[in-house]
Amino acid sequence: MESKTYYIFRNPDNPNYPVYHIINEKHVFKYTDFKIKEIIQVEPDYSKPDLKFTEYEDGIYATNYINEIAKISLLDVNNIDKLLFNFSYESFGPTYRLYSRFLSDNRLDLCDYLIEKNIKLTQFADYCIFNFMVNPSKESLMYIIDHNDFFQISWETIFKSIIPFTRDGEITDYLITLMDNINYKIDYDDIIKNVITNSYTLDIKNIEPIIEKTNINLYDVFKYACSRGKLHIIDYLLDKRIEYDFYELIKCDISTRTLNFFIEKGYYLDGIAIDIIINSEPHNIYKMVKFLIDQKYLTQDLITKQLLDTIIKTNINNLRLFINDFDVVDLVDLDMIIVMAIEFNSMELINWCMNNGININKYMSIIMKKCRPTIISGLIELGAQIPNDKSYYDPTIIENYCMGSDCISYLKTIIEKEFDTAENIIHNIIENRPHIEILKYLLTEVQTEHITIPKLTNVIIRNYYYDNDYCPEYYEDLIKSGIQFDIEQQTIIQIIEKKIVDVQGVIFSNCELSSNLKILFVTIMTDNIDILEFLLEINKYNQDYLQWALIFSSNNITILEYIINNTNVNPISFKQEMSTMAGHNNYYSIDYLRLNGFYTNNDVPTDSKLADFMNEIGIDIFNPNF
């Protein structure tokens, strides 16, 4: 152990199997959150016979037992001296975190102390020192300015960072005077534009000294504020009697908030103004046109092919703004619109094209390839004809998107034309858990009285694994619909429902289930130690079966400890498999494995037996965020 003095870094995620993360004293400021004011000094409890202690990474350790020694203030100069300067300069991490910590607490004396010790800002710290401060006081901000000979932060960064913090112009005024005194040339136009862009709660007092005391281009600032919708700045500059031409101003891609502001000030949007707005292709063309339509400023005579082309080029769905209130049929190419509407699955635009003369049957081959089943069903109900050529049928669209009862018209047509069978469709869509009404319909088309669906096993396991989602009503509905659960599926459901006696009876009567790995996996996943004991005994503690049980239990410490303590399987031999399995969604399991020496950073190969088994179920063990 490198040091006998440690501090709590993270408390256990699982109190039943505690793993304490602790850090040694030279890494306290490197690893602790800058908001923390106090830290607990601890030591491993060496009196415990089963004490475990391991190093995770540089300066971070883990143990299962600790004794608390004292609470240590991180705002006490003596503690800071001990934590920082008994060790190397690099050990306490980016120095801006130290300054931000003390500046946020207005502990300027501690900043003095750091400067006396020549603790300079590390590289790229200019913005970070400001970003990590929490509600800094005026005194803290002035401290940075007055000590910038030491900090060496660019003055541009100081302006851009400090102005949003201030609630009066005093600091800004002080900075401007300072720049004049040291003869430092600064681009105040850029400063103001940056502040306007990046400040959500900008007060006019923040920038008033720049406007009043520097030679910035007020008209440029005015236009920029108009484009950003900063109404309080616009109003302030108007009070300064800034000169502008309204027609020129609206060419500058102003926001809808700004436009509404000027309308409320008494400006009338005549045909010239509207023509300028809609033909200047502003970046917010959708919002601008919607505003003009909603406020009844946009009239039929102002709508041009150029405007519609711009709207459509931005997004075909934007055309929906016009189709209900204006006559635009002669201004667009309907054949182009229908193709784009199909591509974007826009039923509203498809309907509009049909109502204006498009023969939808000409496009059904494209629609079958591009559109979701709900749209195809809707078109069938409107009289569209599905072509007889099976090559247009894409079963993957059914598999991925046919989840709701509004797909039934399309399914009915597919089955009638013998493009697919109801039974095959059921097998293909079941893993995506379709609406029960779809299954009820499909089952009426199945020739046999009852069918079994092997893929349903994976659905049950996967839903429970990812979401702890077991909905008995859904499975009861499946049974009522005529789906027959096979013996494997019945057993898995009984395990989930904790019907231990029933499970044992079924397995006794069906020997092939005793070594079934999916049943073992669900048993461990559901914390069924009684069933696990039964399975291990009936398999006579077969080593291959034990190894699978060990690997599956990597996400369940209770089961894992039971297997380790009650069998002779060696976890060290299966580090890779256990680490991959645990890495999926239980980080406290990883902590447990690491503490006990069962962890490795290397995943199993993607073609390993474990990966193949989990892939068959549909569980991605290589993606912890899935």
Curated annotation (Swiss-Prot):
InterPro entries xrefs: Ankyrin_rpt, Ankyrin_rpt-contain_sf
Disulfide bond residue pairs: none
Keywords carried by this UniProt record: ANK repeat, Repeat
ANK repeat windows: 217-246, 333-362, 421-451, 515-545, 547-571
Protein name, entry field: Putative ankyrin repeat protein L768
Organism encoding this protein: Acanthamoeba polyphaga mimivirus (APMV)
